[in-house]
């Protein structure tokens, strides 16, 4: 009798994806983040589902329904903070996952990489819409400022913004549609994750050396299932520490004030995971230029496979490229810090310099360094 694991039409798909999957024997903990992202997505869908059972997407009651969840629903506060801080964990894992792909040259699997970029955009859109739902001050003004950026698009901009708003300002129609889309998009993300994995399993995983590992593979289970569980335990520890001890550490105190269209907060800023892009947006004095820079700051990832000039795939044996990679990391952290600061000197000039450095490093310095390393290898 054949093993049901290998013969059953549904079970054999799971088997070939998570159990008998041939995996390089030398992948490090940097390869844990894919599975952590899957768990984050499941956590967000589950906590979000239970929150949606008690939430009302009406401007008059949205803020108070969130208060009701935290005060009156059994463990409602836990659900709310798991969902809010779960989003932060999601983005930490996302950025580390993308960073791993950049460092080890995983972007040479172009289909997997491009689906990943589309996923990143979709997750960012979902998180932005989720931030609007509690209908606090920062929710309202964040929604107003960010959606208003689309008015910079020539000719159709104003019509587009009013179409998204469902009126002449951010109001009830906007909140209702954002709730509907915020509920729907995670399921679309889950479907796209399947496509992401489908393309990944066509080629197999990359590994830290960047050298094909066909001759040295091990089954995913038990080796990497155990390794992933360790990563999961560490992530859950960090998440629960945030939720139970510092639930508002990453939030904005302004969001504990109900939305008031007549009172603008002194510093409008998005959640921490968008601050780097927000800093790039603010560093350009022109509105359309800022919006283009904002979109390109992430869309630039698409051309990274074209900018790969080195004869080696991974940065493991390329010290000069490693220096640039960590410079880019430090630059992104600087941008994140600047995004949370008021628009005044010296923050303006620091933000402008950091934005220039960000694009220069990716488009100019990294390809040139790759060529130089090729030359040094021959020398």
From Swiss-Prot:
Positions contributing to heme b b562 binding: 83, 182
> The organism sits in which domain of life?
Eukaryota
Q: Which PROSITE patterns does this entry report, sorted A to Z? A: CYTB_CTER, CYTB_NTER
| Biological process, per Gene Ontology | mitochondrial electron transport, ubiquinol to cytochrome c
Q: Which InterPro entries does the UniProt record give?
A: Cyt_b/b6_C, Cyt_b/b6_C_sf, Cyt_b/b6_N, Cytb/b6-like_sf, Cytochrome_b, Cytochrome_b_C_euk/bac, Cytochrome_b_N_euk/bac, Di-haem_cyt_TM
Q: Which GO terms describe its molecular function?
A: metal ion binding; ubiquinol-cytochrome-c reductase activity
Q: Which UniProt keywords apply?
A: Electron transport, Heme, Iron, Membrane, Metal-binding, Mitochondrion, Mitochondrion inner membrane, Respiratory chain, Transmembrane, Transmembrane helix, Transport, Ubiquinone
**Where found?**
Mitochondrion inner membrane
Phosphoprotein in keyword set: no
One Pfam match, given by its short name, reads Cytochrom_B_C
- Cofactor(s) required, per the database record: heme b
- Annotated heme b b566 binding sites: 97, 196
GO CC terms in record: mitochondrial inner membrane; respiratory chain complex III
- Indicate the transmembrane segments per the record: 33-53, 77-98, 113-133, 178-198, 226-246, 288-308, 320-340, 347-367
Function field: Component of the ubiquinol-cytochrome c reductase complex (complex III or cytochrome b-c1 complex) that is part of the mitochondrial respiratory chain. The b-c1 complex mediates electron transfer from ubiquinol to cytochrome c. Contributes to the generation of a proton gradient across the mitochondrial membrane that is then used for ATP synthesis.
Instruction: Extract the PANTHER family matched here.
Output: CYTOCHROME B (PTHR19271:SF16)
Recorded family membership: Belongs to the cytochrome b family.
**What else does UniProt say about it?**
Heme 1 (or BL or b562) is low-potential and absorbs at about 562 nm, and heme 2 (or BH or b566) is high-potential and absorbs at about 566 nm.
Subunit structure and binding partners: The cytochrome bc1 complex contains 11 subunits: 3 respiratory subunits (MT-CYB, CYC1 and UQCRFS1), 2 core proteins (UQCRC1 and UQCRC2) and 6 low-molecular weight proteins (UQCRH/QCR6, UQCRB/QCR7, UQCRQ/QCR8, UQCR10/QCR9, UQCR11/QCR10 and a cleavage product of UQCRFS1). This cytochrome bc1 complex then forms a dimer.
Q: What is this protein called?
A: Cytochrome b
């Amino acid at each position: 009798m054949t093993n049901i694991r290998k013969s059953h039409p549904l079970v054999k798909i799971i088997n070939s994806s998570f159990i008998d999957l041939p995996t390089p024997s030398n992948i490090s903990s940097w390869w844990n983040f894919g599975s952590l992202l899957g768990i984050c997505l499941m956590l967000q869908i589950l906590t979000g589902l239970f929150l949606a059972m008690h939430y009302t997407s009406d401007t008059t009651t949205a803020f108070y329904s969130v208060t009701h969840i935290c005060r009156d629903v059994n463990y409602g506060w836990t659900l709310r903070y798991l969902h809010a801080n779960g989003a932060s964990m999601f983005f930490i894992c996302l950025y580390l996952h993308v960073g791993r792909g950049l460092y080890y040259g995983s972007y040479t699997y172009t289909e997997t990489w491009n689906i990943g970029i589309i996923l990143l955009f979709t997750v960012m859109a979902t998180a932005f819409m989720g931030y609007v739902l509690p209908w606090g001050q920062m929710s309202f003004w964040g929604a107003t400022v960010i959606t208003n950026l689309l008015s910079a698009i020539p000719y159709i901009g104003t019509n587009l913004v009013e179409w998204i708003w469902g009126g002449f300002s951010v109001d009830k129609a906007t909140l209702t549609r954002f709730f509907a889309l915020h509920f729907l998009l995670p399921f679309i993300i889950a479907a796209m994750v399947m496509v992401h994995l489908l393309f990944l399993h066509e080629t197999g995983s990359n590994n830290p050396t960047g050298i094909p590992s066909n001759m040295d593979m091990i089954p995913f289970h038990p080796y990497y299932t155990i390794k992933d569980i360790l990563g999961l335990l560490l992530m859950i520890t960090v998440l629960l520490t945030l939720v139970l001890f510092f639930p508002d550490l990453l939030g904005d105190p302004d969001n504990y004030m109900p939305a008031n269209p007549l009172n603008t907060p002194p510093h409008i800023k998005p959640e921490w995971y968008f601050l780097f892009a927000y800093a790039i947006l603010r560093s350009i004095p022109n509105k359309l230029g800022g919006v283009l820079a904002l979109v390109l700051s992430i869309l630039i990832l698409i051309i990274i496979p074209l900018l790969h000039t080195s004869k080696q795939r991974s940065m493991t044996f390329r010290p000069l490229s490693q220096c640039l990679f960590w410079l880019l990391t430090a630059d992104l952290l600087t941008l994140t810090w600047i995004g949370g600061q008021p628009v005044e000197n010296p923050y303006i000039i620091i933000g402008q310099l950091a934005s220039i450095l960000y694009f220069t490093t990716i488009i100019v310095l990294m390809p040139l360094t790759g060529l130089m390393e090729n030359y040094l290898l021959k020398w």
